[in-house]
UniProtKB/Swiss-Prot annotation:
Catalyzes the formation of phosphatidylethanolamine (PtdEtn) from phosphatidylserine (PtdSer). PANTHER family: PHOSPHATIDYLSERINE DECARBOXYLASE (PTHR10067), PHOSPHATIDYLSERINE DECARBOXYLASE PROENZYME, MITOCHONDRIAL (PTHR10067:SF6). It holds the Pfam family PS_Dcarbxylase. Its EC number is 4.1.1.65. This is Phosphatidylserine decarboxylase proenzyme. InterPro entries: PS_Dcarbxylase, PSD-B, PSD_type1_pro. The record marks 247-248 as: Cleavage (non-hydrolytic). The active site is at residues 88, 145, 248. Its cofactor is pyruvate. It is an enzyme of class 4 (lyase). It comes from Variovorax paradoxus (strain S110). Belongs to the phosphatidylserine decarboxylase family. PSD-B subfamily. Prokaryotic type I sub-subfamily. It catalyses: a 1,2-diacyl-sn-glycero-3-phospho-L-serine + H(+) = a 1,2-diacyl-sn-glycero-3-phosphoethanolamine + CO2. Heterodimer of a large membrane-associated beta subunit and a small pyruvoyl-containing alpha subunit.
């Protein structure tokens, strides 16, 4: 079966209703039922609870509390690199932005303008720059951290579809990451602007940032944005900036010149928060 055929049912599936329901269930505190669900999830996906700040699953009152669990201090040391990996997950793709085109999968590109919600001026700052797309699987730690020091400038909530995100949909759904619902976070750093995009997916109940809290829901048809240039919201390298309440993917954009990525990086390779991602080629 081709990838396009494999994803065809998702065009027909009531993804929004399923996602809303999953988010509602994940937030409920159901005592022994919640504990049973968490225990089954840990066993099914091989979650390493030994790394969690609270390793006893009976501690978690809801599935969302478990899913967004904190890690023990020191289990993810920061590498000596200009940019460190912001998540636990796996590499989807990374490399140079060709003009304004980001590589998604063989035969599929999408534009930086589409990714950031249609702002061509913002997107132009990353022309011929670099990108990295990282996928978080169900077993992974689901908080997102800063790849480098940054000052928050702007946040954009872009409404969109809710296709599941995995290698099959990346190959079978054109413009997947610029098509799904997403939260675009724009930062300034000592080396220029950079963007972290939190991409939603089927059953991703919501996405949250440390400065705003839950961004979605509400889910509507209108793009929403917030400006922070007059506020001193400063986040250090490795500091938490957001989290997924179930699911998905982070896309990062950096301006030119192209980054010198970790030579060990390759598509599908597992990555850990804090490992070396890239160095700035002009330093």
């Amino acid at each position: 079966m081709s990838d396009r055929s494999a994803v065809l049912p998702q065009y027909l599936f009531p993804k929004q209703a399923l996602t809303n329901f999953a988010g509602w269930v994940a937030g409920k505190e159901r005592g022994a039922v919640t504990t049973w669900i968490i225990r089954r999830f840990v066993a099914k996906y091989g979650v390493d609870m030994g790394e969690a700040l609270e390793s006893d699953i009976n501690h978690y009152k809801s599935f969302n509390q478990f899913f967004t669990r904190a890690l023990k201090p020191g289990v993810r040391p920061l590498a000596q690199a200009d940019l460190v990996c912001p998540v636990d997950g796996a590499i989807s793709q990374f490399g140079a932005i060709e003009g304004d085109q980001i590589f998604q999968a063989k035969g599929h590109n999408y534009s930086t303008t589409a990714l950031v919600g249609g702002d061509a001026v913002l997107a132009a700052r990353f022309a011929h720059g670099s990108f990295a797309t990282l996928y978080l699987s169900p077993k992974d730690y689901h908080r997102i951290h800063m790849p480098c020091d940054g000052r928050l400038v702007r946040m954009i909530h872009v409404p969109g579809d809710l296709f599941s995100v995995n290698p099959v949909t990346a190959r079978g759904v054109p413009g997947l990451f610029a098509r799904n619902e997403r939260v675009v976070c724009v930062f300034e750093s000592a080396h220029g602007p950079f963007v972290l995009v939190l991409v939603g997916a089927t059953i991703v109940g919501s996405m949250a940032t440390v400065w705003h809290g839950v961004v979605n829901p509400p889910r509507g048809g209108e793009l929403r944005e917030w400006h922070y240039a007059d506020q001193q919201i400063l986040l250090k390298q490795g500091e938490e900036m957001g989290r997924f309440l179930l699911g998905s993917t982070v896309v990062m954009l950096f301006p030119p010149p192209p980054l010198a990525f970790n030579p060990d990086w390759a598509p599908t390779r597992p990555v850990r928060l804090g490992e070396a991602m890239a160095n700035l080629a002009n330093l």
